[in-house]
Amino acid sequence: MNLQMIQAHIQQRLQPHFSADEIKAFGFWILPHCEDLPENDRMRALEMICEQLKQQIPIQYIFETAFFGPLTLKVTPATLIPRPETEELCHLISQKNKSIESSNGPIIEGLDIGTGSGCIPIYLLHHNPQWKFTAVDVSEDALDVAAENAFHVGVHDRIQLNQSNFLEWESLPHNIDLLVSNPPYIELKEAKDMADNVLKHEPHLALFTPKNDPLIF
């Protein structure tokens, strides 16, 4: 079973639901997975993946994998799938790190609010070996994923993960040099216009702003 065979099969099964470009991209995800399976199990696995895709389950959740810059991170339905815009933000911050002033010399103390998979602080720690981060989230399940990602990337000794609701804080820690966040900002009234793969499968806690206030954070 090669890439062309996989693409032909998923095109037949998914053509009414996805564009040609999407089907082609799915093939590059699925091929390595199928190649690692015994021949007799490959078609069964392919059928299972196609059924999940037809249910609009994001392929990142099917494989519990998201690519974020040079990093391969774990994602689950407890965490938002990292967006390209977030990657661009991380790249911009990392490029401008020389202009960030710190009271600790070259050591930057960062804080990420609503860390989810941990993609933002882990990316920044990966690119800036002298930085340290505290990352908070209200979701214990999301923090478990972030901990796995930090260990996998090798930055676990420079990140502290805390379960906390930022909206209940009275003030920010005094030793923070850099504050980053990608908080929920979508109002519930916008849900009707959202794609099923987002609305039905990504965590509403990370999508919809509390009290329908996009500026609450």
Task: List each model region and its residues.
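Conserved SAM/SAH cofactor-binding pocket of Class I
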Residues: E88-D193
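Non-catalytic nucleic-acid substrate-recognition regions in nucleic-acid-modifying enzymes
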Residues: M1-K24
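Proline-centered flexible-loop/turn and helix-kink motifs
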Residues: P16-S19, P129, V155, P203
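Soluble or luminal CAZymes and related metallo-dependent hydrolases
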Residues: N2, I6, D41, K54, ...
